[in-house]
Each structure stands twice: as structure tokens, then as C-alpha cells.
Amino acid sequence: MTNESAEFNLLTNQGVMLSQDNLTWTCMRAHEVYDWKYDYENVVSYLPLSHVAGTFIDIYLIMYGGGAVYFADKMALQGTLLKTLVEAKPTLFFGVPRVYEKIQEKMKEAAKANTGLKKTLSDMAKEASLEHHFATFEGKPGGGLKYKLGKKVVMSKVAKALGFERTRGFYSSAAPLSEDVFR
């Protein structure tokens, strides 16, 4: 039979039914969109498994295409997520907007300590990186010397400090990202 129930997620005032057809179709499409590398990908699980995004990513997406899941401790959303990210070095990162907001807050806090040449290089790298990524979103060539220099000198160090040196894709679910956080 088609469209049989695979799982029910019970939330505070509601329930969500995930069907077998829905999960299978979504996994197939996600693997195409994310250019999934079989038995190579790893993700960090920090959302409760009662959260539909947490269940889909941490269980079904990994089972469908192979890979590893690093389970963060229960205090991940209270500040220990960074430790797990640095240890796991995820290849794909799936976050809810609040997690991206917290990462942005920490980055802004760290940037305040930069002065002189370090601040100039950091600002240049951020600007060049934004230009590069917005150009590639529009199908235009990105890069250039400023971007390559900024990536090598600044952005690679930031990525390593956050555990994202192997991360090739960042994805958001559950709610829209604000434009400020997206940048």
C-alpha cells in the first residue's frame, strides 16, 4: 500500500504524520539537491527527535544515503554545540534560524576584538565572501583575488574555529532566516 504512516511526531498541541511516500520522495530529492556523497557525509544532531527536521535529517536522510551522525549532548542549544561541531567537522550543517542567530552573535562578539590590520582584513574578507556567494547564487562567476585571499587568510580560520572546515553546505529549516543572518 502506498502512503502508509511511517511515523507520528507528537508536539505540545498538535501531531505530525510522516508518510512512507513522503519520506522516500523527500530523501531522494534531498540527496539530489545536497549532492549527497554516499557513506561520506556527516551531520551533527542537536535538535530533539520530536522535531520533524531533526527526525528527517538525523535518522531518515542518513539511513537513506549513508553517513554518520554525531549526537550532541543535551545542553547543545545552551552552549555546548560548538564543542561538538569542532569535534565532528560536519560536511553538511542543518540549522534552525535560532542556531544561526547564536552563531552570528558569537561571530560579531569575536569581531569586536579585532583592531588595525586584523579588522581591515576581516572586513575585506567578509565583504569579498558576500560578493562571491551572491554572484554564484545569481549564476555569475564569483571569486577573484580579494575573495581567494580573504578565504585563505581569514575565512578558513573562522571555519576551523567553528568546526566548519569540511562543511560544503549550510541549510535552514523550520522557519525562514532573517536577511541579516543569511548574510
Where are the regions that the model predicts?
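Conserved mid-sequence domains
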Residues: G169-Y171, L177-R183
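Conserved AMP-binding/adenylation subdomain of ANL enzymes
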Residues: T24-N42, L49-S156, R166
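Short, conserved loop/helix-junction motifs that constitute active-site signature segments
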Residues: A161-E165
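Structured core elements
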Residues: T2, M17, V44-S45, Y70-F71, ...
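Conserved AMP-binding A3 loop
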Residues: M1-C27
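Alpha-helix/helix-capping structural signal
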Residues: D21, R98, A175-P176
